[in-house]
């Protein structure tokens, strides 16, 4: 039914008045062009879409029905882009059709992308606007195109609704839509706090792991419509001003610099989440902003984001002063601001005094460290260091040049057949290893009483004279030495005691094994307090016999130093050595040989060989370091004139010199040489018979 004429005139006047209200822009050929509408359509290829003419939804106050009734027609044009040629659209009525104020695509193709212009006009008025359509494909392996996503933000611990956008054209008012939701294009078992309502997904309490892409899927006819929304989770909106991390608000920070150098003042602050507002941080000098200063040498760096999490940021900004001058010194303030307030902190740029505190501290620290290391090394390797220095740079002892021996060795002699299992190692060390190492390896000249002292009636005086001729006194404290009080001779003789008390001779006391609990050990402790120059060295058993052990190094360190080569065995057996008993030893050996020759000459022929072998065997057993054997001429006589014209004496038992045989204790067999027992040539004195020669 046609509308009455007056009504049409009124409608036309109303529509014309509506057009006159809108301001024209981009008018061409009498048609107002509103360019491209703000609403853009983005769909995936194969999905349906409805493009509405935007003129009826924001530009004019009328609808398609009223415009058509007023005699206005709606036409559609397509172009590739703004300013391109527009051509009318020929609708095929199936895939692409015009329905009232819209164009329907069922479905879209990639070539459908472009600008669609809708024009309403009559003979007097014309208005035009373009709508953008973008058709894209899914990203590889995904169910969405990352350039066609919607974006939502949610605050931590708060609720959030995610809507399935732009599906109103596909919903039926009489039916509930069947919408499926995916996260990252995969089905998910949703927790109870996530609820679905028609076309929305409600998260009652947002968590950090809710961040991601949510896709809703709706079926429309034979097509599928998908919309994807990316959810970003942030911290709750802050209600506090930013917090300064450096410099601190509560105190003035002083930064020293040198004139002519560069200075860098860095300000760091923490900003809570404030929405899309960027952090505001800057420097000021007094009441002036840095950019307002006349100096180009003073400038600010860009704001740097050091850390960021859920919208909260830690940022920094630096103030750089190139070539610091006197006028650049002073107070600089760092300000931080957000919608909740402003805070600031100050830094005082101060001239550095010419004090090398750091350098001095570093140097002293290095020296102290070097000193500690040196002391530690010296403590651990003192003996090795001193021996090395002495061997390469040391000098011999001058105060001992007039002494014949390097050391006097005092110990208790025990025959090997009397060694027991407990003290055998100590006795072997004292009798064999110690003298052998000192003489043969280190080349020292020792005075060993059992070997070098000829017994006389003045035995104690002879010992004192020999000790006085030695640079060191070595006392070997074996268990037998302690039990027999081997040191008693040093207490009986006044000269020896004074030498120990006054420090005229340095004493080296070698303790073998554990001596505590042994009889007379208390006297050993008293002896130690008596000696002024005393060094105690522990011998810890056979492991100390090794050449590289600490024991030998310590002993060598305490012994006098002299540059000599280690003596050989032949040198140690040389009877021409000079000393307090050098000549006496020569005579002793010759006299012994003469006595032995006389005894053998008068003995029975069968006993000569036996006595000769037995005598020399016993001598070898009792004397380990020097042999007193002498080859007697076959005639059995000894040219005593070879001794020389010097006055010499010896303490040989006169029975041997007279040719007498010692009395045997056995009475089972008669003595073959009994006839010679009373043939004394020289009378024996009481003093001579009282002296025994076993101390050799």
Curated annotation (Swiss-Prot):
It is found in: Cell membrane; Cytoplasm; Cell projection, Axon; Cell projection, Dendrite. Residues 1-24 form the signal peptide. It catalyses: NAD(+) + H2O = ADP-D-ribose + nicotinamide + H(+). GO terms for cellular component: axon; cell surface; cytoplasm; dendrite; glutamatergic synapse; plasma membrane; postsynaptic density membrane. The active site is at residue 491. The record marks 34 as: Essential for interaction with PTPRD. Residues 25-134, 143-232, 242-350 form the Ig-like C2-type domain. SUPFAM superfamilies: Immunoglobulin, Toll/Interleukin receptor TIR domain. Residues 403-559 form the TIR domain. Residues 379-696 are cytoplasmic. Residues 25-357 are extracellular. Belongs to the interleukin-1 receptor family. The TIR domain mediates NAD(+) hydrolase (NADase) activity. Self-association of TIR domains is required for NADase activity. May regulate secretion and presynaptic differentiation through inhibition of the activity of N-type voltage-gated calcium channel. May activate the MAP kinase JNK. Plays a role in neurite outgrowth. During dendritic spine formation can bidirectionally induce pre- and post-synaptic differentiation of neurons by trans-synaptically binding to PTPRD. This is Interleukin-1 receptor accessory protein-like 1.
């Amino acid at each position: 039914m046609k509308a009455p004429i007056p009504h049409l005139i009124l409608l036309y006047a109303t529509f014309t008045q509506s057009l006159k209200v809108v301001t024209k822009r981009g008018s061409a050929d009498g048609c107002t062009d509103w360019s491209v509408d703000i609403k853009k359509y983005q769909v995936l290829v194969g999905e349906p879409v409805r493009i509405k003419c935007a003129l009826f939804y924001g530009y004019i106050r009328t609808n398609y029905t009223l415009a058509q009734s007023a005699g206005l027609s709606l036409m559609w044009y397509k172009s590739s882009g703004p300013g391109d040629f527009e051509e009318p659209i020929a609708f095929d009525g199936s895939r692409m059709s015009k329905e009232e104020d819209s164009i329907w695509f069922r479905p879209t193709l990639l070539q459908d992308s472009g600008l669609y212009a809708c024009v309403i006009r009559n003979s007097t008025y014309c208005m035009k606007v373009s709508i953008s359509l973008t058709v894209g494909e899914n990203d590889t392996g995904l169910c969405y195109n990352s350039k066609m996503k919607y974006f939502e933000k949610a605050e931590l611990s708060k609720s959030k609704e995610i809507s399935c956008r732009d599906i109103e054209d596909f919903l039926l008012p009489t039916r509930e839509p069947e919408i499926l939701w995916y996260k990252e294009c995969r089905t998910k078992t949703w927790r109870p706090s996530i609820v679905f309502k028609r076309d929305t997904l409600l998260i009652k309490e947002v968590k950090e792991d809710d961040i991601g892409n949510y896709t809703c899927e709706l079926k429309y006819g034979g097509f599928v419509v998908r919309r994807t929304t990316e959810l970003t989770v942030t911290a709750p909106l802050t209600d506090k001003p930013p917090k300064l991390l450096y410099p601190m608000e509560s105190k003035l920070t002083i930064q020293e610099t040198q004139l002519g150098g560069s200075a860098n003042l860095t300000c760091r602050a923490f900003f809570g989440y404030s929405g899309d507002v960027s952090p505001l941080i800057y420097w000021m000098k007094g009441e002036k902003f840095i950019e307002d200063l006349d100096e180009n040498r003073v400038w600010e760096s860009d704001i740097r984001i050091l850390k960021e999490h859920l919208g909260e940021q830690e940022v920094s900004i630096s103030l750089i002063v190139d070539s610091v001058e006197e006028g650049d010194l002073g107070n600089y303030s760092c300000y931080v601001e957000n919608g909740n307030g402003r805070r600031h902190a100050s830094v005082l740029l101060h001239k550095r005094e010419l004090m090398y505190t750091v350098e001095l501290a570093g140097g002293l620290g290095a020296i102290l460290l070097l000193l500690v290391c040196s002391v530690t090394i010296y403590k651990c390797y003192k003996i090795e260091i001193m021996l090395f220095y002495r061997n390469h740079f040391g000098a011999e002892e001058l105060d001992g040049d007039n002494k014949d021996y390097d050391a006097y060795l005092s110990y208790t002699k025990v025959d090997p057949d009397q060694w027991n299992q407990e003290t055998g190692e100590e006795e072997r060390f004292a009798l064999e290893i110690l003298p052998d190492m000192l003489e043969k390896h280190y080349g020292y000249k020792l005075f060993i009483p059992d070997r070098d002292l000829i017994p006389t009636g003045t035995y104690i005086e002879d010992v004192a004279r020999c000790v006085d001729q030695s640079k060191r006194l070595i006392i070997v404290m074996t268990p037998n030495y302690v039990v027999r009080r081997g040191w008693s001779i040093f207490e009986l003789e006044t000269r020896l005691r004074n030498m120990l008390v006054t420090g005229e001779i340095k004493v080296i006391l070698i303790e073998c094994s554990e001596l505590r609990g042994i009889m007379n050990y208390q006297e050993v402790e008293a002896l130690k307090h008596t000696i002024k120059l005393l060094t105690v060295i522990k011998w810890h058993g056979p492991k100390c016999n090794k050449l590289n052990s600490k024991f030998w190094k310590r002993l060598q360190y305490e012994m006098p130093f002299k540059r000599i080569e280690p003596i050989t065995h032949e040198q140690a057996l040389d009877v021409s050595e000079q000393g307090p008993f050098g000549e006496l030893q020569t005579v002793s050996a010759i006299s012994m040989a003469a006595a032995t020759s006389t005894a053998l000459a008068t003995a029975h022929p069968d006993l000569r060989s036996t006595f000769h072998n037995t005598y020399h065997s016993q001598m070898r057993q009792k004397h380990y370091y020097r042999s007193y054997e002498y080859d007697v001429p076959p005639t059995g006589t000894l040219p005593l004139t070879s001794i020389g014209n010097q006055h010499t004496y010896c303490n040989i038992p006169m029975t041997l010199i007279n040719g007498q045989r010692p009395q045997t204790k056995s009475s089972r067999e008669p003595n073959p040489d009994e006839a010679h027992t009373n043939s004394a040539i020289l009378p024996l004195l009481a003093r001579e018979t009282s002296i025994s020669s076993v101390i050799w």
